[in-house]
Amino acid sequence: QLVDAFRMKDGTAITPDKESGYSTTNYADTKSGWVFAPAGTRNMFVNREPRFYVNICFNGAYWIGDQKTRIQLYYTGGSGKKGTWDFPRSGYIAIKNVSPSSNPKNSNYIKRPFVIMRYAEMLLNYVEALNEYDPGNPDIETYLNLIRERGGLGPVQSDLNQNQMREQIRLERRIELCFEQLRYFDTRRWLIADQTDGGPFYGMNVDAGNSFTDEAFYEKTVFETRVFRPEFYLFPIPQSEINRDPQIVQNPGW
């Protein structure tokens, strides 16, 4: 879901047609404009928006700050299922906030402060609330576009209604704040977790592949099936608390 949420470099959503420029087949003949996508990169990873390349490491990408080492996520690769015990089950590696000086192979990790809140989250909180309270307010586009511009995209479409703008804000929030421990809470307060947090989750086929161009690795494959039930929107009240006050009513489903 997350990998597919990142758009193309012109801001269009990825769709399997010529208009979007997205393709799930074949490989780039030349190096793209992004340093992480060398010649030979699968086309599905080429010409995506800049934030894709600083958040997601895909099969064949250069490692952070290294223009020589291409990450091998296919089955027999160095970072694949056969090559290491801690391979990524989805076929992707999260690299947000990873320092170029880090070297996991040598257990050399660069410490960074934990970010509690940053400016982009404040802006996204503001435009989300404003869109619910006063749809059409010009501040919505102004501050949403600040985030998009910093992320390398053009301005949001200007004639969106409230529902359409809500979807754009939520998408922007998902991309900009990914891997920042917020998505879990967002899907629950929006009451969409029953649609997004359960069912099959897809990735690359980590049980196949002997090279960067092995077609079998790129087959969309279920790597995990999750369960989300309506009662999961709320945590159960501890029985010890209910015992202390019999008037407390347990949350639904628990």
Where are these regions (language model features)?
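Acidic/polar-rich alpha-helix caps and helix-coil junctions
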Residues: 1-254
